[in-house]
């Protein structure tokens, strides 16, 4: 199953849960990889998102600065790709579970965020 989202600059982004990647269709019709290497895993924080590994990404969202947030479901994390294409972990430690009141979001991220 794929998830589609349009960014603020009008580009259509495609979340490939089975391809472990995020691609976009540019305004001139080209398909460009944005994040993920195409096979599952966890790596890449601090480097180019196109060289990072994702595991079953589910959905994406954009903030006002056009940073992209990826629900990296298989890794129990939310990953952030900044406007320069650098990926980082925004939330989650990779542990499955529920956070209790007062705990930080980095401790747990539910399996299906």
Model-flagged regions — what are they?
Residues 17, 73:
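Short loop/turn segments immediately following the C-termini of beta-strands
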Residues 11-13, 67-70:
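Conserved beta-propeller blade signature
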Residues 1-3, 30-56, 86-113:
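Gly/Pro-rich loop segments of beta-rich domains
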Residues 6-9, 62-65:
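Residue-level detector of Asp-centered blade-edge/turn motifs that repeat once per structural unit
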Residues 20-24, 30, 76-80, 86:
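A short loop-to-beta-strand structural motif that recurs across blades of beta-propeller domains
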């Amino acid at each position: 199953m794929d998830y589609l989202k349009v960014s603020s600059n009008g580009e259509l982004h495609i979340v490939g849960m089975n391809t472990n990647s995020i691609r976009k269709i540019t305004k001139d019709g080209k398909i460009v990889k944005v994040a993920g290497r195409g096979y599952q895993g966890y790596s890449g924080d601090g480097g180019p998102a196109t060289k990072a590994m994702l595991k079953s990404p589910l959905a994406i969202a954009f903030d006002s600065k056009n940073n992209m947030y990826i629900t990296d479901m298989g890794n129990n994390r939310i990953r952030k790709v900044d406007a320069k294409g650098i990926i980082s972990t925004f939330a989650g430690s990779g542990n499955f579970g529920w956070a209790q009141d007062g705990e930080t979001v980095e401790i747990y991220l539910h399996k299906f965020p």
